[in-house]
Amino acid sequence: MYFLSAEERKQLFGGLLPRARSEPVSEELRGWSWHQPPLQPIYDLKLSLFEVANRYCRTGRDLYLRRVLGVETSPNLPMIQGAIFHKTVAKVITTAKRLIYQVGIDDFPEAKRRLSEPDYLSIESFRDRLSQEQIEEIKEKVRVLWEFESTRICSRAEELLASQPRLNEDSLVFHSIPVVVEQKLDGAFLGLSSHLSVDAFTFATPVIFDLKFDVKRDFHRLSPTGYALVMEAMYEFPVDIGCTVYACFKGNRILLERDFYLIDNELRQNFVEERDEKMRMIYEELDPGRPEECYATCPYIQSCKGE
């Protein structure tokens, strides 16, 4: 999911990185300026990053129902599938790293063999919420996803092993799997949860990756923007590039589209405004009202309509 093609690397190094240098972000909108406006939180609240960046409900009434009225709901099928697929991608990447360290480069074929076996444990925590038919369908998609990702990892590793005779395990992991998945972040400086988790991040060229099993939405760029601000607040180095990875299944195939962009002043300002508006709604208990049109998979739709 996070391994770039030659064309994408060219776009990144020849386009976005030079633009990031020539179009600098305002200091006041860097995460390390969390202690002063406009980044300084205006209310003593903590929001999850999803609560800030989510605009599926155009008025944000889902957040009002959850945080002000205390309405509880269960995850629906698209939410469950998304959670399972995210866990699967993270699992195959961490498993590949672990196997390289455990088995070593001299017996890489054994690591490759063991990595070829899909891990279905991510389904177990949702088993009581799914029918047998749904379980089998999701299991097949997990298999396709696991095989897609593990094959790409092994190909990258074998290419490196063939060209670098003095490679060690640590170097192989770094160069063939150059991402950190589910990195834990503390967003407290910015009025966000202390238990954030970013889908993937690359340190060599700081890029925030956000994986979506969804169609493109105009607000999807807000999530990497929020993570970039948090990382800047924690580590005090600039994070200027985001990438939303759109994945979908077509039979036994995975289709991918990666949307790269600068995390510029406009995106940062939009994120801060969204955070402040939602904090105010919760703090002052302001009902934003129902949207003109509800999205089909909203888990709060019955409570929202009073049914």
Annotated model-derived regions:
Residues 1, 175-194, 233-307:
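Metal-dependent nuclease catalytic regions and adjoining charged, substrate-binding loops involved
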Residues 1-197:
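Metal-dependent nuclease catalytic cores that hydrolyze phosphodiester bonds in DNA/RNA
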Residues 59, 85-86, 181, 196-215, ...:
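Conserved catalytic cores of phosphodiester-cleaving nucleases, focusing on short active-site segments
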Residues 80, 219-222:
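A generic structural signal for residues located within well-ordered alpha-helices
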Residues 101, 105, 111-112, 116-124, ...:
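A broadly structural signal marking compact, well-ordered functional cores
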Residues 135-138, 214-218, 238:
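Short, surface-exposed loop and linker segments with low hydrophobicity and enrichment for Pro/Ser/Thr
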Residues 202-215, 220, 234, 257-266:
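Structural signature of nuclease core domains in nucleic-acid processing machines
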Residues 222-233:
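An active-site-proximal "capping" alpha-helix that borders the catalytic cofactor pocket
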